[in-house]
Amino acid sequence: MITLNNQDQPVPFNSSHPDEYKIAALVFYSCIFIIGLFVNITALWVFSCTTKKRTTVTIYMMNVALVDLIFIMTLPFRMFYYAKDEWPFGEYFCQILGALTVFYPSIALWLLAFISADRYMAIVQPKYAKELKNTCKAVLACVGVWIMTLTTTTPLLLLYKDPDKDSTPATCLKISDIIYLKAVNVLNLTRLTFFFLIPLFIMIGCYLVIIHNLLHGRTSKLKPKVKEKSIRIIITLLVQVLVCFMPFHICFAFLMLGTGENSYNPWGAFTTFLMNLSTCLDVILYYIVSKQFQARVISVMLYRNYLRSMRRKSFRSGSLRSLSNINSEML
C-alpha cells in the first residue's frame, strides 16, 4: 500500500496500530461517550428549553453542546472499528466520519473565540452591555461559522479516498488519527490558518486586553459577580484551548510538513485523545454560565444521595427486622 507525501511522491503506507493503542482507544472513547453524551444532552436541553432569558453566551453554548453531540455520536463507530479491525459501513460513511473529525475542532475553536469576544464586551466595554442581549447577531455569527466550516470540510468527502479501501477486511484509515488527514496541503494549510490561528489570536487578544483592564482598575463600574463569572469563563477557555486544541494542531502542523513514512504516530494519537477530551471539559463552561445547569447537576447529585440514604435505611431496617425475628424465635 502507498499514499502520497507533501511532494506528491509515493511513500510506504502502514495502517497497523499497536494493540495497546486499540485497548486505550476503546477505554478512552467509551468514557468520553458516556460522560459526554449525558453532559451535552443535559446542556442542550437546559439552554434550549429551560433557560428563560437567552443571551449571546447561551446561544454560543447551545451550539457548543450541539457540535459536541454530533462528534460524540461518531465515537461508537470508531470503537467498533478498533475492536473488530474492519469497517463494514462503507466508503462514503468513512469519508463522512473523516470530515467530522476535521469539522469538530474547526467549529469548536470559533465558538470559543465568540465566547471570548463576548466576555471582552462584558468587561472592557460595559457600555455596550445591551449588545450581549442581542441574540440575533449571535445566531447569525453561529450560522456563518457552520456554513463556513461545512464548506471547507465537505471537499474532504470528494478529494481523496481511503488508500486501503479494496482490502479485506475493509478499513477506514481516515478516522484512526490525524496522520491520515494530511494529504491535501492547500486545504489543510487553510484549515490550520483560518480555523486555528485566527480564532486563537482573537482569544489571546481578548484575554490580553481584559487582563490589562483588570490590572489597571478600569473595570470598577462592573458588578463583582459579572467580573468574577467572566474571569472564570476566560480561565476555563484558556485551559481548554491549551490542553485540548493546541497540542492537536501543533502535532498536525508537524505531520503536515513532514515527509516521512505514513504510519502509526503516538503523538498524533495522544493529541487526538486530548482533542476529544474537550467534549467532556465543556461541562465546566456549562456549569459556570448557566444557573439552570448548576441546578440540574446539583439535583442529580442530591437524588443520588437520596437513593443511597434510602438504600442504607432499608438495609438497616431489614437488619433490625432479621435480628428481632431471631430474638423472637430464641424466646
UniProtKB/Swiss-Prot annotation:
It is a multi-pass membrane protein. Its main location: membrane. GO terms for biological process: CD8-positive, alpha-beta intraepithelial T cell differentiation; CD8-positive, gamma-delta intraepithelial T cell differentiation; G protein-coupled receptor signaling pathway; negative regulation of leukocyte chemotaxis; negative regulation of tumor necrosis factor production. The chain crosses the membrane at residues 27-47, 57-77, 96-116, 139-159, 192-212, 233-253, 269-289. Residues 1-26, 78-95, 160-191, 254-268 are extracellular. Gene3D superfamilies: Rhodopsin 7-helix transmembrane proteins (1.20.1070.10). Glycans are attached at residue 14. InterPro entries: GPCR_Rhodpsn, GPCR_Rhodpsn_7TM, GPR18. One of its GO terms (cellular component) is plasma membrane. The keyword Transmembrane applies. The keyword Mitochondrion does not apply. Pfam families: 7tm_1. Disulfide bonds join 94-172. It is found in: Cell membrane; Cytoplasmic vesicle membrane. Residues 48-56, 117-138, 213-232, 290-331 are cytoplasmic. The modification Phosphoserine is found at residue 322. GO terms for molecular function: G protein-coupled receptor activity. G protein-coupled receptor (GPCR) that plays a role in diverse physiological processes particularly within the immune and nervous systems. Becomes active when triggered by various endogenous ligands including endocannabinoid N-arachidonyl glycine (NAGly), delta-9-tetrahydrocannabinol or resolvin D2/RvD2 derived from the omega-3 fatty acid docosahexaenoic acid (DHA). Upon RvD2 binding, facilitates the resolution of inflammation, aiding in tissue repair and homeostasis. Belongs to the G-protein coupled receptor 1 family. This is N-arachidonyl glycine receptor. The lineage of its organism: Eukaryota, Metazoa, Chordata, Craniata, Vertebrata.
